[in-house]
């Protein structure tokens, strides 16, 4: 009996590992390559010199009343310093202006250790206009949810 349970658990763990391996092989290189090879439009501004760059961003304004757009061969970036204070600074740009490994930043937000600022990356046209770029990174959550559901189903099938 213990041997059968051990084999079932081993099979279940093997299935989970295979699923996560498959997802990693397909999803991560695709996302990284997409960010590096496709041209998108990003806002280019700094709230120190252009009040239109501040949050909340008025994306319904006429194009002439918005910060300039630039063609970007990479990802859009939004950086915030001194968040939620009167000294808040917002900068929007393209990763081509940064020395950064795109594989490490695709669909990611990094927080300052003090919690007073963050830097987010996204890969859709004008996506750095968003107040909260976390909304652009739901793909990872979806993949993890699907993987857990498939693992649970496989575990149920293996236990029959």
Swiss-Prot record:
It comes from the Eukaryota. It is found in: Cell membrane; Membrane raft. CDD domains: TFP_LU_ECD_Qvr. Residues 78-92 are annotated as: Loop 2. The keyword Transmembrane helix applies. A lipid is attached at residue 128 (GPI-anchor amidated asparagine). Consists of a single Ly-6 domain, adopting a three finger fold stabilized by 5 disulfide bonds. The first loop contains a region essential for protein folding or that is required for localization to the cell surface. The second loop mediates protein-protein interactions. This is UPAR/Ly6 domain-containing protein qvr. The lineage of its organism: Eukaryota, Metazoa, Ecdysozoa, Arthropoda, Hexapoda. The gene is qvr.
